[in-house]
């Protein structure tokens, strides 16, 4: 494995696996959140400043293995050009004859974007022949796509085999690994994890893993109601996973045995329907009337969580506190985001990861006020769980 910081790119074509799987406007197909594109720019610029040229490859969405306009990476061109400050080239088929002509003719300082890798079904199958064809676009390989590092696809894992002495992580992937390692391996205390989102079932592994590391575990979002019901609370028609009530009890027992403080909401904003125009009330979380559902944490919970966050030296946040997409139920998530930003100012290392909490800090304009916002939802969770990620292992081999 080489290091991007010391590698000599002069006269070389760098094949970079980026993660440009960005949301697009359904009508105009314009990029609506360019976080992932912005995050890849430092790696691209490093190659160009070192006298090399760049071939970018990525997937976008879940096409049915055939070209579709709504999944075309041409929709990202103007955004990439905006951040690079010059025009780039585009190849309409990542392994078409024209694509190879274009990549072979690249001059130092030039950038070529290949069309969506998933327009070929061989990408997700991790096909070796497909990976070998892709490898012909570059003299060295850089993986900078943390968002797909947990997938053993042709462009994320197999292609690395064809660059045994010329493969490396990009700056973004390096930073992602460093940030998670810092949370998992640092001896700074207290370490607080904030876990939200809808379902306990999707977070069991991560919570179990975190109980070995954290001092405090704050639980919010839809999953909190499963914990409250497991303790005998009345939660009305709030989201509850009936088949995971015992799981919640087990988690609380293990936390107690390990000396971890679990903090659950004590009050909630509840509504008579899942709508921004619903009737709303505020009350104790274990006393929600029948026919009503909890959709956000309320004042007292915010204050309790805030105090713990501000006293922490390391903070991991994964998952919102309520239905933050609706204005009436976003205050809990907004206030927790503000507290995490404030803790960062006080010197805490703060890592935000997982689709919805990332969307929240972006929506509230606080992404630049935390230490690191992870671009890899599933990949970050799997890495935190201690799973070996194929995209990372392929570079380290």
What are these regions (language model features)?
Residues 1-397:
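Active-site loop-to-helix "anion-binding N-cap" substructures in soluble metabolic enzymes
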């Amino acid at each position: 494995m080489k290091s991007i910081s010391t590698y000599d790119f002069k006269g070389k074509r760098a094949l970079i696996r980026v993660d440009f799987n960005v949301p697009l406007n359904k009508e105009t197909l314009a990029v609506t959140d360019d976080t992932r594109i912005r995050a890849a720019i430092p790696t691209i610029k490093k190659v160009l400043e070192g006298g090399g040229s760049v071939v970018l490859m990525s997937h976008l969405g879940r096409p049915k293995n055939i070209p579709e306009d709504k999944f075309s990476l041409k929709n990202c061109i103007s955004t990439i050009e905006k951040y690079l400050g010059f025009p780039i080239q585009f190849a309409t088929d990542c392994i078409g004859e024209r694509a190879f002509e274009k990549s072979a003719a690249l001059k130092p300082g030039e950038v070529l974007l290949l069309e969506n890798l998933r327009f070929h079904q061989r990408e997700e199958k991790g096909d070796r022949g497909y990976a070998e064809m892709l490898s012909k676009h570059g003299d060295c390989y850089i993986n900078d796509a943390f968002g797909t590092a947990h997938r053993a696809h042709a462009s994320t894992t197999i292609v690395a085999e064809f660059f045994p002495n010329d493969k490396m992580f990009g700056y973004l992937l390096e930073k992602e690994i460093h940030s998670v390692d810092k949370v998992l391996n640092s001896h700074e205390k207290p370490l607080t994890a904030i876990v939200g989102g809808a379902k306990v079932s999707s977070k069991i592994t991560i919570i179990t893993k975190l109980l070995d590391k954290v001092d405090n575990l704050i639980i919010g979002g839809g999953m909190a109601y499963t914990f409250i019901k497991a303790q005998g609370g009345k939660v009305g028609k709030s989201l509850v996973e009936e088949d995971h009530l015992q799981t919640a009890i087990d988690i609380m027992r293990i936390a107690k045995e390990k000396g971890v403080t679990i903090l659950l909401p004590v009050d909630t904003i509840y509504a008579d329907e899942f709508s921004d125009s619903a009737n709303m009330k505020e009350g104790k979380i274990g006393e929600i009337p029948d026919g009503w559902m909890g959709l956000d944490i309320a004042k007292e919970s915010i204050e309790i969580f805030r105090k713990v966050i501000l006293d922490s030296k390391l903070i991991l946040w994964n998952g919102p506190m309520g239905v933050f997409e609706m204005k009436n139920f976003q205050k809990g998530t907004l206030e927790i985001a503000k507290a995490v930003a404030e803790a960062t100012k006080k010197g805490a290392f703060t890592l935000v990861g997982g689709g919805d909490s990332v969307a929240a800090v972006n929506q509230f304009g606080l992404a630049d006020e935390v230490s690191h916002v992870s671009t890899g939802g599933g990949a970050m969770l799997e890495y935190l769980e201690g799973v070996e990620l194929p995209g990372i292992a392929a570079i380290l081999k």
